[in-house]
Amino acid sequence: MKISALALLATISINGQVYAQDSQIQPPPHQPEQASAKMPECVILLHGLARTSKSMLPLSEQLRAQHYLVVNVDYPSRKFPIATLAEKAITPALENCRQYPISGINFVTHSLGGILVRHYLSLQKIPELKRVIMLAPPNKGSQVVDNLKNLPPFGWLNGPAGKELGTESTSVPNTLGAVDFDLGVIAGTSSVNLLLSLYLPNPDDGKVSVENTKIDGMRDFISLPASHPYIMKDDAAITQIIHYLHHGQFLHAPATVDNKEL
């Protein structure tokens, strides 16, 4: 399959947008006065490749309204390999959570952020860990990376971590194995990048196929009509995230037969 060089330049970033980044951790707010006396849980937000914490702000605001302490992380996703990024992003975020009296630590991630969590937890435990929710994670890699990673613009836009997200058996996601923590995965089924969708098995979100978001050991899975670059801002996705944090499962539509609920 061939795509013009001009089109590639417009679409090649695995997350669709490119931002200047710096490694800055935003500390969580104090617990609101109206919240219950029970110690709150901390939620660490990890954005995707070539994004910043700004992409997670709508979600952050909704979680704060639910009385979670939120650490919305900025990390230099285009500068380092996944192993380095996992340490740079997650260790300071945990330190921020632990400054406060909390009853547990959760993660909500977008795209690459989920692979950072998998890598970190493959090497060390987080004693306070409760739940992890991944939005559009390339848990089995992406065929977009397979096809485009050797083109110079891809490396410039996505950095070394982007090149590690292929579907080959030696890619970082595929060497991490099954998960052994409480994980819910939300996949998108809508694409705003039809050129990149040509590389992907349907259904897909324009960057990752629905099938490749799944991982052995996950506790629950749901797909939504959202696209890869915007799924973290999707109202239905945010509702599902909050429900999973509260209950450990997603809101699934009840099965029906002849319009009658089972």
Model-derived segments and their meaning:
Residues 2-46, 50-73, 86-87, 93-100, ...:
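Flexible, membrane-associating and regulatory peripheral segments of lipid-active enzymes
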Residues 27, 32-33, 45-46, 91, ...:
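Short secondary-structure boundary micro-motifs
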Residues 40, 122-262:
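Helical cap/lid subdomain of alpha/beta-hydrolase-fold lipid enzymes
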Residues 41-54, 58, 64-76, 82-180:
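Serine-dependent carboxylesterase/thioesterase catalytic core
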